[in-house]
């Protein structure tokens, strides 16, 4: 298994798909990383040489990923909550942020229904 950015990549997958298992790297960014590292995107991870893996590590290291990205996102949400702005209040109340209706639907964000006793 190749280890890049602290994540073990599945050896049977293509490089560009395997890179997507790293938090913060999606389809577009994984292709850009492969192009910048001069690695063919359809190469299997098990077929990569050590020099190619090292080039991928260098390219992936240029981005904010994994724990640092999770921390940044969490801090941004916490900042909104501390500011008492509308989005922060919606986060605090576990409600949708972007104008979706809440009278019906919004079950994913609100959680399972709470029974009302009559």
UniProtKB/Swiss-Prot annotation:
Keywords: Ribonucleoprotein, Ribosomal protein, RNA-binding, rRNA-binding, tRNA-binding
Region annotated Disordered, chain positions: 99-118
Keyword match Ribosomal protein: yes
Family matches, as PROSITE patterns: RIBOSOMAL_S13_1, RIBOSOMAL_S13_2
UniProt GO BP: translation
Top-level taxon of the source organism: Bacteria
GO molecular function: rRNA binding; structural constituent of ribosome; tRNA binding
Tagged with keyword Translocase: no
Quaternary structure and interacting proteins, as annotated: Part of the 30S ribosomal subunit. Forms a loose heterodimer with protein S19. Forms two bridges to the 50S subunit in the 70S ribosome.
The protein's role, per its UniProt record: Located at the top of the head of the 30S subunit, it contacts several helices of the 16S rRNA. In the 70S ribosome it contacts the 23S rRNA (bridge B1a) and protein L5 of the 50S subunit (bridge B1b), connecting the 2 subunits; these bridges are implicated in subunit movement. Contacts the tRNAs in the A and P-sites.
Family under the similarity heading: Belongs to the universal ribosomal protein uS13 family.
Cross-referenced PANTHER family: 30S RIBOSOMAL PROTEIN S13/40S RIBOSOMAL PROTEIN S18 (PTHR10871), SMALL RIBOSOMAL SUBUNIT PROTEIN US13M (PTHR10871:SF1)
Protein's UniProt name: Small ribosomal subunit protein uS13
Gene: rpsM
């Amino acid at each position: 298994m190749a280890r890049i950015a602290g994540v073990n990549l599945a050896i049977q997958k293509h490089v560009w798909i395997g890179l997507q298992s790293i938090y913060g790297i999606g389809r577009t960014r994984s292709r850009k990383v492969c192009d910048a590292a001069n690695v063919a995107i359809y190469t299997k991870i098990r077929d990569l040489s050590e020099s190619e893996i090292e080039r991928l590590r260098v390219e992936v290291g240029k981005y904010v990923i994994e724990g640092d990205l999770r921390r940044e996102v969490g801090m941004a949400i916490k900042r909104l909550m501390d500011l008492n702005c509308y989005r922060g209040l919606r986060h605090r109340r576990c409600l949708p942020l972007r104008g979706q209706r809440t009278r019906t639907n919004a079950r994913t964000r609100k959680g399972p229904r709470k029974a009302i006793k009559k």
